Design a protein with these regions (language model features):
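Non-catalytic substrate/cofactor recognition surfaces at enzyme active-site rims
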Residues: 1-163
Length: 163
């Protein structure tokens, strides 16, 4: 999603090959957990639902879930030793993933699990919802999103869970 990177098949292959090589190199040098302490915290969350499309899909029976003026979901944080995982209940932007990683205080691997606990569509920065913005495809992306407050609610919830 960076704006200054070519959006081509060749670029996607380059990034994929680089990531694959990195993963294989890391397998040759496994990390040992410093301890085996298990931490699991979760919180039920109510997201304001501003997208009428979700309600219409529910009313038409396309989605087997009740949507009202809000939608209930869940966010979780797990740590095993010095490895930590945080869940995002939808498809998140790099901004939220990087922000979540910044909240994690562990010294080991930091993993963000998207589409975990739920599938609430795109989780976007509030600026995507601003009228007249010039963000490419923002009209489509926001039509597949619960609403502009979702990203901040996830971040605040994770801030409370990651202590």
């Amino acid at each position: 999603q960076p704006e200054d990177v070519p959006k081509s098949y060749a670029q996607a292959m380059k990034i994929g090959e680089k990531l694959g090589a990195y993963v294989v190199s890391r397998l040759k040098q496994p990390q040992t957990l410093s301890n085996s302490q298990l931490v699991f915290r979760r919180q039920l969350v109510k997201f304001p639902l501003q997208n009428q499309g979700f309600q219409q899909l529910s009313q038409a029976g396309v989605v087997k879930r009740v949507f009202s003026d809000s939608v209930d979901s869940e966010i979780a944080y797990t740590a095993i030793g010095n490895a930590a995982m945080a869940t995002h209940p939808g498809e998140t932007s790099p901004a939220l993933s990087l922000s979540t990683r910044g909240l994690m205080k562990n010294t080991g691997p930091k993993m963000i699990l998207g589409l975990s606990q739920d599938a609430l569509g795109y989780i976007l920065k509030p600026t995507f919802f601003e009228t007249g913005n010039t963000i490419p495809h923002s009209q489509y992306l926001t039509s597949m999103s619960v609403g502009p407050q979702t990203m901040n609610i996830i971040r605040e919830t994770l801030q409370n869970l990651i202590k």
